[in-house]
């Protein structure tokens, strides 16, 4: 890699990168990928600045190098590449002369035309993830962020790309060339996988001077300096220490060990109450897609263009009306919102050129649905100190809900096969070393089993929706942007297919903190009549919007088409995790791999081929009231994947708590089955900790029900 860097980059850039690594005490002979990354970043910063000047009229112009007009002012001040002291001197000088706010971190450039600092990012990962990391680190609206990737993607604050398209294309071409050159030399995979998340200043922070003396004075007894204390903490093994402390505890602490027998455990108590309701961010088994095969229309790949093309495939639209109202909402507003979407889509079609994005008119119905101006006013605490009865407002305890059959049906459906292919082979990642040939074979077998699975569709749908929503939240903070809910797949014959599930309308999204909420209205197509399970759709207002002709064995039949509308909300951190659902594939693959490994160690040879190709053998899938359910290896793969996907879709504090606490009971039961004669104390407290997590979440309630089935059959 070092040889490649020295051949590929300008010697001046290489020299600057060497200095930077030396400044931070890093060895470029060892950290070769970092060396390449620093050179790439420097080159992008220089290319960003190249040829851009400001003329005497204050206008930004482009001038090639051989132009004799040398009196022009450079548009960009380059800060990256200078040593830290000089860089901060330049930043301070700019702030003093322009009145710009001083940034907390060293930026890369200053734009004299737009009067703002610029942070340039070059990533080997997805631009959205890297943008989010940069934004979270900088936490400043005054520094403009512009991210480039090696695949030609880019992302910038408020979708303001600063430079003209030609200048940006030059940068993207150079990055693509670097990637190709690395790939030709077999360096790309290592380089791509070596990228870490954005580092914070603390990782590089050296304590010196007064702060260092204070740190040394503040140490516990017996420690002479901070390094010794750090070394002790890093190497601290708590177990023996805790056991010693337990023996010194008061005799009043009752920790009497009780034997754990087959008759000891009782079933977990599930809550009573009305049935639980659907709380996923998008419809699962009830979703309906409007699809186009082999899309080749103008603007193919632009979500709004794809959505309009999909909408044109359906001819059964009719005057919408409410069939299942939301009990607490102003239902006519949901109806008006759908009519507004239809009207504004029609307006777009009447235009000469379809825009890339659509911002909805801020009508009264959308303002209501998106909670505009509904948030309570925030008041500074200092202004309230004198109020004698100041207290936190009372919040109601969540209403207990009982388990309902629909969530088991949802899970069963997620394990089923569809007639489409949702992932290509490379979704799970490439081999890194030759020894991974067996792993490749396992991965290919696994992919073949799950590529058609409905749970895989949910992954791709979730990734798309969360990415689009986060993008819009960053780029159009004040707008009510219309976001089509789209997925891409292939038919069994290999033809490409674009699917539209419905639309999202995003509310105002000034998301400063990870947990700040953006409201959105989702409108999703379905053929499911909500009156069959009204409790499942408690949070929805459902409209009937058309009639769909369906072909069946007995001919054509007409079914009413519904639109499920609800107000919902999410946050940056939830969208980030939603965008990262693909590792669900990896998690379930690893679980299958451990089964193959166990089988191989018994037979003392690799059993991958036999494991996947022996269709007659069945494997345990899970527990049900009937006992241990078994199925083919493909069914096991799909069940494990569906569990992983549902953990992501229904992620909640209730699930975290239940998983952590029930695992303790599971380990004790497992020890009993292995004849290890386990003992417990305060088993009642453990049950209490488990049961306080069973409130109203459908996925947690289903897991608790499965756990009870396991207890019944495990202790027979």
From Swiss-Prot:
InterPro entries: INFV_PA, PA/PA-X, PA/PA-X_sf. This is Polymerase acidic protein. Its cofactor is Mn(2+). Binds 2 manganese ions per subunit. Plays an essential role in viral RNA transcription and replication by forming the heterotrimeric polymerase complex together with PB1 and PB2 subunits. The complex transcribes viral mRNAs by using a unique mechanism called cap-snatching. It consists in the hijacking and cleavage of host capped pre-mRNAs. These short capped RNAs are then used as primers for viral mRNAs. The PB2 subunit is responsible for the binding of the 5' cap of cellular pre-mRNAs which are subsequently cleaved after 10-13 nucleotides by the PA subunit that carries the endonuclease activity. A motif (Nuclear localization signal 2 (NLS2)) lies at residues 184-247. One of its GO terms (molecular function) is RNA binding. It comes from Influenza A virus (strain A/Korea/426/1968 H2N2). Mn(2+) 1 binds at residues 41, 108, 119-120. Influenza RNA polymerase is composed of three subunits: PB1, PB2 and PA. Interacts (via C-terminus) with PB1 (via N-terminus). Mn(2+) 2 binds at residues 80, 108. Belongs to the influenza viruses PA family.
